[in-house]
């Protein structure tokens, strides 16, 4: 399968551009949403078969997990594992990423709703505080997580679940990155937060700026680096995780 490359704003646009599908694989669905003002997003619900995560790019988001609502600012992260009740709303103009891992039919649900049809996917309406305990939920303010330092890079683990490993990489100029490689058991993808890192995908080298997205499906050769001169930050998403977060720990010990 060919790699996916979306420059800023690109992807499958729905609801007049308010939601853009960046990735739609069996293993994960990633959307980028823009809420122009404070408004409701999703009422309390849970997913039986997948985790639901959020990363705020701009503005403010209020995320309910179990029976507790937390306010997320740019750079903050939240994750509701399987069967944990959650919902969200924007508190101002807000732009954020939403990760469903595995996809759970979320992308097709959005397409159906965009056509005016009922839709439906792995989602069950529920009261706050019902369902599985929220003790396994993840909340990290901007910059927080498990910080692992390596040569010319810092990797901050935001989520390390069976369904997904989500890492925020800070890449100094000169970060060489891994050699081109493939995965035979998961999708590896990247969202550029800052700078202009370089990606190798489908035998091409691309310098991509903030707001760009790259996905390497199973069997797709890929790599990433930061030739500089600026520092770069990227979100790296492995779905399923296949223990990538544990391998990072080993490399950093």
Predicted regions and their residues:
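Glycine- and acidic-residue-biased ligand/ion/polar-headgroup-sensing regions
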Residues: 49-61, 66, 185-197, 202
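Short acidic-glycine-tyrosine-enriched beta hairpin
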Residues: 5-6, 67-83, 203-219
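Conserved short histidine dyad/triad with adjacent acidic residue
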Residues: 31-47, 150-152, 167-183
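A hydrophobic/aromatic-rich effector-binding and dimerization subdomain
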Residues: 91, 98-132, 236-237, 241-252
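Ligand-binding loop in jelly-roll beta-barrel domains
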Residues: 26, 82-107, 218-244
